[in-house]
Amino acid sequence: MASRLAKSAICAARVRPVLSSRTIPAAATTLTSTRSVSNVPTEDPKTKAQSIIDALPGNSLVSKTAILSAGAGLSIAAISNELYVFSEETVAAFCLLSVFAGVAKMAGPMYKEWAETQIQKQKDILNGARANHTNAVKQRIENVKQLSGVVDITKALFEVSKETARLEAQAYELEQRTALAAEAKKVLDSWVQYEGQVKVRQQRELAQTVISKVQKELENPKVIQQILQQSVTDVERIFAAKPQ
């Protein structure tokens, strides 16, 4: 593996063009003019380094440095012990990972914005539902508050119903008493009428008896003679009692 790396380095050195000391100032001048003309802002190396450090796992700078050192040591050990062969697949994998990292870096803010929009939309829906539920509960509470006097009203109505029932009972009792009094009066009237009829019949019978008895006695001559004598005696006494 080491011989292969050495051969590739030698070939690269042979293929690489050699720059003369004359061409270096010209290239530097061209690069300087190009940088002065360009208005594209360059990224601060400190910021870039800080972003790389922040991307590493760990909570402190010491842990991140330890992780980076351990990764580098493991990579060197794997390559030196030929546990990992640096080949075209490694270059392809590195390029692919670079492409993925670039896509993630470019599409990350858009995805983040879209995700935040969706999250905000869901939050708005949930907040709206909660507000509607709160308003419904408040409205229900207000409706129930309007019925807070139902107990007192029910008690008053119950008292009124009891009083009404009592008055109805009294009215029914008075009606029954009135009906009973009317029936008793009717019975008494019929009894008085019956007694009057009985008295009239008795008087009629008594008168008939007396008349028949008198008529029977008048048929006797002795009785007639006694009556005449008594009448004459009475007349004489009356005339005798008159003053002369």
From Swiss-Prot:
Question: What taxonomic ancestry is recorded?
Answer: Eukaryota, Fungi, Dikarya, Ascomycota, Pezizomycotina
Q: Which InterPro entries does this UniProt record tie to the protein? A: ATP_synth_Bsub_B/MI25, ATP_synth_F0_suB
- Major localization listed first in the record, in broad terms: mitochondrion
Protein name, please? ATP synthase subunit 4, mitochondrial
Q: By which gene is this protein encoded?
A: ATP4
Q: Which GO terms describe its molecular function?
A: proton-transporting ATP synthase activity, rotational mechanism
Q: Which GO terms describe its cellular component?
A: mitochondrial inner membrane; proton-transporting ATP synthase complex
- Extract the SUPFAM superfamilies matched here: ATP synthase B chain-like
Question: What the protein does?
Answer: Mitochondrial membrane ATP synthase (F(1)F(0) ATP synthase or Complex V) produces ATP from ADP in the presence of a proton gradient across the membrane which is generated by electron transport complexes of the respiratory chain. F-type ATPases consist of two structural domains, F(1) - containing the extramembraneous catalytic core, and F(0) - containing the membrane proton channel, linked together by a central stalk and a peripheral stalk. During catalysis, ATP synthesis in the catalytic domain of F(1) is coupled via a rotary mechanism of the central stalk subunits to proton translocation.
Q: Where is the signal peptide?
A: none
Q: Which UniProt keywords apply?
A: CF(0), Hydrogen ion transport, Ion transport, Membrane, Mitochondrion, Mitochondrion inner membrane, Transit peptide, Transport
At the top level of its lineage, which domain of life is listed? Eukaryota
Q: What subunit structure does UniProt give? A: F-type ATPases have 2 components, CF(1) - the catalytic core - and CF(0) - the membrane proton channel. In yeast, the dimeric form of ATP synthase consists of 17 polypeptides: alpha, beta, gamma, delta, epsilon, 4 (B), 5 (OSCP), 6 (A), 8, 9 (C), d, E (Tim11), f, g, h, i/j and k.
Q: Where is the transit peptide?
A: 1-36
Q: Which family does it belong to?
A: Belongs to the eukaryotic ATPase B chain family.
Q: A Pfam family matched by this chain, by name?
A: Mt_ATP-synt_B
- Compartment(s) where it occurs, according to its Swiss-Prot or TrEMBL record: Mitochondrion; Mitochondrion inner membrane
